[in-house]
Amino acid sequence: MKATAAILSLIASVTASCLHGTSLLPRSADGTVDINSFNYTNTGGPLTWYGLNGKNSACSKGKHQSPIDIVTHDIDYATANSIRFNVPSADNTKFENLGSGLEVVLTNGTLVTSTSSYKLAQFHFHTPSEHRINEEYYPMEVHFVFENSGKLPLLSLSTGSIQTCIYAG
C-alpha cells in the first residue's frame, strides 16, 4: 500500500482537541485534564463546535476549518521524501483520557519539511474519522500534532485509507 502526502494550506485546521498540550492550550501544571465537551452526534457534532468557546466563533463563517473534506483531485501533492516524520522511541509516554478520546503524550518525535522542523506535542485518535476524504468518513483517524513557533501542523492518518494528509497550520 502506497501512502501519499498532500500539503493543504488551511487557516484554522486544528480542532480543539488537537490544540491540547500545545502553546495555545497547555496542559495544567497540576496534571489534571479538562474533559472535552464536543462529540460527533447531530446536536454536538462538527457543525456546532464553533459554539463551544467564544474563541471559535469565526469557525461558523469560514470554509477552511476542521472538519474538512479532502478532495484528492483538488490538492497539491508533496514530492517524494520532502516530508520526514520520525518518532525514535516511545520512552516516557503518557496516556490521557480527554473524555472524547485518548491522547498520547510523546514529545520526542519530529516532522521535517523543506522549510521547517516541528516537535511532536501529542497524538490522539478520533472515531469515526474527523475529516473526510472524497466525502467518505473512515472508522478511525489519528492526528499527530506538532509545533514550532506557534505553528501547528497536523499529520493525519485515516484507517482504511491510503491517504496521508498534512495540514500546514
Question: Can you name each region flagged by the protein language model?
Answer:
Residues K2-T4, S9-G169:
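Alpha-carbonic anhydrase
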